[in-house]
């Protein structure tokens, strides 16, 4: 929800110590983290032995469906035993083709990833410069802490009126008293887009 990174190397140490497997849900990491966009495991430089990585094809890759990657024996076991796989519907061919094409873009166009992280740095710096409290700034998901539900909804409405879609996230999705505005960046946002969005946040500060 907040785009924050867990201490995966430390967690992997614990699983190895107890002869357990580690399952990493990398829904927001695929295509974004790592030198080649392989996700959180690549970001931390971790080996994939006794680690399963799962994720979605619907975020950075812009398609539908999901994936599970790991040692062949483990994947084959799940392919034959996991009810969630056995009883699911196969993805449409067009979605599979779109996901494969997106993976090629991830591999061949690292400039898109660099541009994304430049946008993250520009955006977080701008919000903090305005005095907003950021819960996390380690990913393209940047949540802005507000606190109360009423104040958060009011801010979301004001931003929408200014032409900016930034959803309000409230309990029970997050703990009481920690409602927030969830902002998300892409590599396609221009410097002008970010300046306009920061202007909307600044205007909302003046209104409040």
Enumerate the language-model features and the residues they cover:
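Active-site core of PLP-dependent enzymes with the aminotransferase class I/II
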Residues: 1-19, 151-152, 192-193
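Active-site PLP attachment segment
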Residues: 36, 42-77
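A short glycine-threonine-serine/GTX helix/turn-capping micro-motif
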Residues: 65, 82-91
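Short hydrophobic/aromatic beta-strand micro-patches
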Residues: 69, 143-147, 184-186
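AMP-binding (ANL) adenylation modules
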Residues: 93, 148, 171-176
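Conserved PLP-dependent catalytic core of the aminotransferase class-I/II
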Residues: 97-165
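PLP-dependent enzyme catalytic core of the Aspartate aminotransferase-like
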Residues: 161-164, 173-208
